[in-house]
Swiss-Prot record:
Designated name of the protein: DELLA protein GAI
Region (PFYRE): 392-495
Family named by the database record: Belongs to the GRAS family. DELLA subfamily.
Biased composition (Basic and acidic residues): 1-15
Region VHIID, residue ranges: 269-334
Positions of region (Leucine repeat II (LRII)): 348-380
Compositionally biased residues, Low complexity: 166-177
Tissue specificity note: Expressed in both vegetative and reproductive tissues.
Keyword vocabulary terms for this entry: Gibberellin signaling pathway, Nucleus, Phosphoprotein, Repressor, Transcription, Transcription regulation, Ubl conjugation
GO biological process, alphabetically ordered: gibberellic acid mediated signaling pathway; hyperosmotic salinity response; jasmonic acid mediated signaling pathway; negative regulation of gibberellic acid mediated signaling pathway; negative regulation of seed germination; regulation of DNA-templated transcription; regulation of reactive oxygen species metabolic process; regulation of seed dormancy process
Protein origin, superkingdom: Eukaryota
Amino acid sequence: MKRDRDRDREREKRAFSNGAVSSGKSKIWEEDEEEKPDAGMDELLAVLGYKVKSSDMADVAQKLEQLEMAMGTTMEDGITHLSTDTVHKNPSDMAGWVQSMLSSISTNFDMCNQENDVLVSGCGSSSSIIDFSQNHRTSTISDDDLRAIPGGAVFNSDSNKRHRSTTSSFSTTSSSMVTDSSATRPVVLVDSQETGVRLVHTLMACAEAVQQENLTLADQLVRHIGILAVSQSGAMRKVATYFAEALARRIYKIYPQDSMESSYTDVLQMHFYETCPYLKFAHFTANQAILEAFTGCNKVHVIDFSLKQGMQWPALMQALALRPGGPPAFRLTGIGPPQPDNTDALQQVGWKLAQLAETIGVEFEFRGFVANSLADLDATILDIRPSETEAVAINSVFELHRLLSRPGAIEKVLNSIKQINPKIVTLVEQEANHNAGVFIDRFNEALHYYSTMFDSLESSGSSSSASPTGILPQPPVNNQDLVMSEVYLGRQICNVVACEGSDRVERHETLNQWRVRMNSSGFDPVHLGSNAFKQASMLLALFAGGDGYRVEENDGCLMLGWHTRPLIATSAWKLLPDSGTGAGEVEL
């Protein structure tokens, strides 16, 4: 008898995995089709006592797969009547029976959700998630709790995707749905079409819970976010995963160690430079303003508040070398943070630039200064020479916003700039308000901003673009550059969302906010000309997905955005006639 039961189970398994009418060799199949009372039924399943029409096989297979996953995840929740050990013999309507089982499960889950009050608010549509609340939680939280956020979701891994059955065959396993019950609450994705909308709603609901200091609800929601993110693809999955990590760190109070460590950030920024046009646009537009300000000057001095790898200056040096009447003497002062290994990275950059200057025939002088913050810099050591003999330009790219984390720091630096009395100050900043005092406002702004930024990265990495202007197209983006660029932006997200106080240095503000600050500090805007606008637009033709980038002129400033959303802004400034003390009177 046992052997017969085993044989029957084996035949049943083959019937389910095949999911189609077999061409079997038994004499059963030789009967006249017209004489069968159940014509149209799947014959292989009919032998086992199940009445299923062949046309319904795909639907039954899908429902059985959902039922199998639901039954597997409910065993730990004490729902005994759905145990996989229960035997259901020969239902006359298999499709209806399976549907009733699923409906029963859904009802139980809905009751469970109501009791535990973990539904996401603001989602008016029917739930696409059936979730199980854990009745116990660990009393301590550590780095291990971040395993609820699937790190693999950053990459396009097919193994992490949930597939919905569309054919008559189906798998009897659900390994892709299995998660560690101690790490996440098990879910069943019934309808993936609404998952993207639900993911955004869950992110915002989690941020609202954090704002209200309801950390229990926030903990439950952040686990949902990690699971929902895996079901997405492309930019949405990546940006959601970074926001989930940032929220988890804030909830569990596991703050990133040295999250904005300078040397690593510099390396990541180099990859960001290669991947998309934002930094190139920043360097190009700032250089154009500096070049025009230096017209007719025989000696020029640029003070770079963020030298990093010095990628901005070869283009300016080459432009100066081609100037009618010969190039001016070019002096560059680079400011940068100390390196963890105490290497003199600034001098290495200066040495490379000196080699280039010698090649193109430009008289060149370089000095580097190390400072933890621009506010710590003593302007008297910059060797400012009289303005009659040397024109000075001050350049800041993605740097001044970091001063907003220290009270009075930005005012001190702007006052020092006034004492230096430069011909021009070029300022490039992110076009976003990530410095709001209310966390939920800052979170929502960051979510929209970085979603757009990741979307543009996704386009840059998809293909190379052919330029309609005849310029050679940009080669396809290296995959390593793309991934490291995502990490570069992800670290910013983590700082904006997870950190507070002086540790939160990514305090981006909008162009209008910088206008108010610069005007109140005694600076007057310098109009960036139409020539810079045209050349910046041509620059975008070099990049994949160039059609999505937009250059916009805004009251004399230039902004680069993706489709309709501005993302960075370049502005230029000069001192008002009655501001500053003039060269030779530098003081703090």
